[in-house]
Amino acid sequence: EFLAAMHTLVQWRKEDHSNEEFCGRIYKIRHDRQGRRVVFLKVEQGLLHAKEEIIVPSGQEKVDELRIYEGEKFTTVQQVSAGDLCAVIGLSEVTPGDSVGARLFHQPSQLVPMMAVRVQVGKEVPVQALLSALRQLEEEDPLLGVEWNQQLEEIHISIMGTIQLEVLQQVL
């Protein structure tokens, strides 16, 4: 009854920002089963089309494909508009917190890793392969802070705690 009264009294309207210049914010990066980089963003204003060139902090990049995810499944679409959450294939130079399009800025994470650890590798594991895998994970979580010490031939990473370390061990 209360909700019905609220619905009657309050008029909800969604502002239409689709006629403005495109602007979006990157909030997550993952990799699909084919190893392609999947950049998740929220469209804050304007429209974004597949095959369109957009402004990114390092210059311009082409949107090869647009996806709308529902769990693990996705639908390929030709266009997304203000308010949509989507995934983009084709952006290689962005990180979580970056904006793309008309307004460029980076909003860094407020979190700071509490531990720095040296990654110990068994002789059967090629160090460069492990470094490559860690760099891919670093794209998804920039706070990982992967560092390669050439002189000591050691890999160092920054982590939030022991649970993250256990998760990394299982992922790798």
Q: What kind of feature is each model-predicted range?
A:
Residues 1-172:
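Structural and coupling elements of P-loop NTPases
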